[in-house]
């Protein structure tokens, strides 16, 4: 699978930074957040060269049919669980869904998302130099 369309769920520091970097490398990026003021703030913090290359949305459906979505939703478990409950019902079955971190992962009452695939926790990143703009 070739990754061309990337969704970022959550427009906080980690989310808008990822969107900025992916857009600077030419990917089609959609940045989603459940709160419009957070998206507006993210727009002001993303580099000018990337800002207009990113689609900003509060509509969850806009990221449900992309190649990969990276979840960066706030660590408020009620909000995070609400995101997964809604998103997993509409996401394409062959989409890659990744998460940066779930603080209380071990305390989750059950599966986060009924999906095919493998969850790699504590994955080792051998080298990110090829992807870093710095």
Name each region found by the language model:
Residues 20-23, 64, 88, 110:
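A structural alpha-helix within SAM-dependent methyltransferase catalytic domains
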Residues 1, 64, 117:
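Structured loop/turn residues at beta-strand edges in well-structured enzyme cores
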Residues 1-58:
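NAD(P)+-binding Rossmann beta1-loop-alpha1 motif at the extreme N-terminus of oxidoreductases
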């Amino acid at each position: 699978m070739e990754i061309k369309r990337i969704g970022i769920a959550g427009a906080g520091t980690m989310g808008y930074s990822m969107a900025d970097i992916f857009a600077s490398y030419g990917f089609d990026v959609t940045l989603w957040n459940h709160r419009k003021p957070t998206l507006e703030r993210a727009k002001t913090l993303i580099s000018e060269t990337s800002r207009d290359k990113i689609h900003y949305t509060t509509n969850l459906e806009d990221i449900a049919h992309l190649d990969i979505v990276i979840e960066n939703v706030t660590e408020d478990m009620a909000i995070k669980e609400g995101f997964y409950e809604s998103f997993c019902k509409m996401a394409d079955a062959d989409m890659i869904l990744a998460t940066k971190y779930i603080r209380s992962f071990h305390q989750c009452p059950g599966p986060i998302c009924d999906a095919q695939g493998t969850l790699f926790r504590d994955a080792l990143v051998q080298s990110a130099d090829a992807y870093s703009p710095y």
